[in-house]
């Protein structure tokens, strides 16, 4: 029988082996391959200042319970953070990531603390409870290994006190953790999380980095060359995560994609430091590129709820070659105004106008916005399509209170309804601007209530408003690169579902129906084409001048055509000058009648002595009433000149149509007119046709020819019909 000391040592050893064997003590959820191994890879530890800042963040976003269900009292006084690095961006990101991870496991960590009797065994101030739970998460994530600090690292007394407490209860905490895992029948505490949260973590671990190129400071080719010199290779798609590669996005020409593991390396290159390459979520680039496709070179844009200043800068840079202005509203604090203008100057943005009013307080007839043609609306949303909420909320300056709901996999119904109402109010207010022609509505949510329902409700609501041309739903202006994207856009909405390659995104374009009384000028068409880059090397001003000259030339009398082709000659004649055309036709037919008469007198004798019945056809005593017979009898008189000038006026209705018809379906009877057809017709009338395959004219063509002939002075004048 073992003594109490040996029994305690054996219990400690068994617990430590279980801790080292199970990946439940890792948040990745993977089981250790070798269950007998006790080798544990060290994970970098956080400095004291990160723990304190993360504890204060957790204190503000933690899930608060009703008084009868309170497990741990967290106090109300925040800890004093270190002021040396509190404003550092990387420091803030580490603190928020630690606080958000703790928030996801709040229920589990609280159960472990209660089950280990740590609070009943010690007396510790309640204001340190937030620090305890944050450090416990990191402690078990590192498999209860001691933290290693650098020599010059600043130490905080409260952090040292809590660390000593957790090390003293290491065995009991490990045992409580194992019991919690067994209770939920889970391989790890990671599998206790809701499925939506687990999928979110999996996507976040592989989500690539998106960065757009600031073309006001550097060209695309210069960026490619710079990256190549630093060892990066350009590929078509990001498939390998272990190499220094990048790809160009298919939807946005100035957006590059990098594997996630390259972020630390990229942050140290000059392209990032000099604002030539900007990290930002792809959804924001999709929004600004949609606006770019809708505006002319002199149209202004109004941006609402932009969040990050990078979105405003991106819109400004895409329109840097235009005379457009980019209006951004809602910057009310002077400090934010100063920081925003400073950033815009560094990035080379020159066409941004800041409005201090909120969007809903701006009148639709504001004189400053009379040239605004497109509104970009990025409303506050639930961000349920985002895989890494911390990264997105910090970069886009979104509401940090959303982290509490996103840690549990979704928003409560009442919060979602509040967001939907705000989105509807902003969209309907945007529709009131009379000069605006299009609205781009973009969210990072996958909730139908925030996307399709809001847009459709706003479209229905507009009918009861002011009498203006209504808005309608327009198809996406972005390229659809895959079959799945095409299927998702069948209802005229652009969607990206959350995946390992991108966050979720919803984008809708509303365009005002064109007033039927208004006509689109050439200037507008050319301006739109120039804005889309379709007129490279062509100056719009010169094009407009050429167009004016063409209009003047049309007003002058039509000149004689010089093409030698009847159809092109007809197109060169003004269709309104009917009298001039008729006069030319009469002159031409009169001239050809003389030529035809002289030709008839000089015809060879052998032509007359053809078939016996052919001479009857040429008797001018009485013209045949059948148009087909008359048309076919006329070619016997072979014209002497095939390059004679051709008539202009009524040529277009007489455009020949060649149809090969078998003799058995000839429209006339088998006797009579067909017997009278001259045999010579098949040899010299249609040069180049195959022998034995005659070509006939349709009856409609013959009737048209007869009408032209009847307009002449003589009924038996036979001209060679040069247009056939």
Curated annotation (Swiss-Prot):
Task: Spell out the Basic residues composition-biased ranges.
Answer: 543-554
Q: Where do Polar residues bias regions lie?
A: 595-618
What the record says about disrupting the gene is: Male infertility. A mutation which results in the conversion of codon 333, encoding glutamine, into a premature stop codon is detected in chemically-induced mutant Ste5Jcs1 mice; these mice are characterized by sperm motility defects and infertility.
- Where is composition skewed (Basic and acidic residues) in this entry? 562-572
For this protein, the record's Pfam families field holds: Methyltr_RsmB-F (PF01189), NSUN5_fdxn-like (PF21148)
Q: Where is the active site?
A: 444 (nucleophile)
Answer yes or no on keyword Chaperone: no
Region Disordered: start and end of each range?
Answer: 542-574, 595-629, 698-724
One GO MF term: methyltransferase activity
**Tissue expression from the record:** Expressed in testis.
Family under the similarity heading: Belongs to the class I-like SAM-binding methyltransferase superfamily. RsmB/NOP family.
Q: Please give the function described in this protein's UniProt entry.
A: May have S-adenosyl-L-methionine-dependent methyl-transferase activity.
The name this protein goes by in its record: Putative methyltransferase NSUN7
Species for this entry: Mus musculus
| Gene it is expressed from | Nsun7
